[in-house]
């Protein structure tokens, strides 16, 4: 469906409102599937999809859906392994670009991990999951929060199964995390050990007397700890026990026996010794991590396609959740043959709008006794809501053609080919503006098809007399072609004389309140020319005025009421 003039701006504002509510960028792509269309079957299909989706999507899922993001499996080159293959397999293996490849066994010695298809090292096939299973495991591990969120949205699904498999590799990740922080762990243990040894020395000193105490203090001041520990073997045993205990704690978390602390005081591990230990552990962990990843990835691979589908489905559910929020208290409009209307429609661009009921074309029994007309002239008070009503009509018609619910208690519409909306341009006047506006109206009226044309005060850019003649003829042509037209005009009486087939409605300012402010009922009265605002403004000035000013205003007011 084609949107012309200010109808495009209304659509952009509706889209902007929706997009601002969508926090996940990937979910915004679903909006593109709901561009306004003139295909009746497509509109019905969209309505059915949204009816089902909005009914089933749960508000409590939002917390989990907002945690969803893409899980990206990056391609990486591994320098810690080499793949030994037959001459025939070299080209295929090199194309994978995952690690160094050779067919010469003499080139494999310096690598921690030796993979092979010809009987050396770890037996593999030439495929990514065998050569670099970490490429699958690491991204999944790093995105456990996404998997956990998906498991809440789709219990028992692919994410759930992958999380169960990842638990088998959890211990290795913990070891690797400890390895990264090994320097800090050892330094902390050093401090802890030295503090405990100092405490033991102090306590032990209190048990000594006489010559033993003198010898102890002399050796301690001289730093002759070897003599001290040799002389006092019980103390030595206690300190060795503390060191062994500290090493066991580190060994337990690393899963490998470690002897790193010197049997001396103060305990201090040289940095080069820590680095040597880290290199040794890294080598062992890489092999362990590879083997466990290889085993785990075989269980995970069958679920990856389903996982991808779950992520896309989660974006779709989030999109539906946003639409559900946006369209709360909306209604799906009924598709009819000849009419556009709504009961208690609410303008989405106005805060706390007054609900309004209106129609053009057939009313389908919703407005008994009201004249049905394809051409409607809307008259009445300035600032009474006439332009807002045109805006509301365009909102409802655009949303309806998107397949969306609309802001009303009840609504119906004819599937259109085009919507034209000519909003009043308050700062544009003169011959140029008149010519441009007239050309725009002629473009709207020409051609065939189902059209809705919304016009806001065409007469404001030319003389009222000329405007009445031009509009009358244009509206006759629109009537002959079966177009729907709602035009805001102060020329209701003049136009009604020229085109009796049109219905004239009015928005009335009811009067003045106790503070002399205008009271406006934004619900149009059908078949009634709206009472103009100028009369009420004159009345307000007459009631406020004094002396001669009041007398003049009262004389003007009498002219209105003759």
From Swiss-Prot:
Multimer. Keywords: ATP-binding, DNA-binding, Hydrolase, Nucleotide-binding. Optimum temperature is 90 degrees Celsius for ATPase and DNA-binding activities. HAMAP family: MutS2_archaea (MF_00971). SUPFAM superfamilies: P-loop containing nucleoside triphosphate hydrolases (SSF52540). InterPro entries: DNA-bd_MutS2_arc, DNA_mismatch_repair_MutS_C, MutS, P-loop_NTPase. Pfam families: MutS_V. Has ATPase and non-specific DNA-binding activities. May be involved in recombination and/or recombinational repair. Not involved in mismatch repair. One of its GO terms (biological process) is mismatch repair. The lineage of its organism: Archaea, Methanobacteriati, Methanobacteriota, Thermococci, Thermococcales. This is DNA-binding protein MutS2. GO terms for molecular function: ATP binding; ATP-dependent DNA damage sensor activity; hydrolase activity; mismatched DNA binding. Divalent metal cation. Highest activity with cobalt or manganese. Transmembrane segments: none annotated. It comes from Pyrococcus furiosus (strain ATCC 43587 / DSM 3638 / JCM 8422 / Vc1). The keyword DNA-binding applies. ATP binds at residues 380-387. Belongs to the DNA mismatch repair MutS family. Archaeal Muts2 subfamily. Its cofactor is Co(2+); Mn(2+).
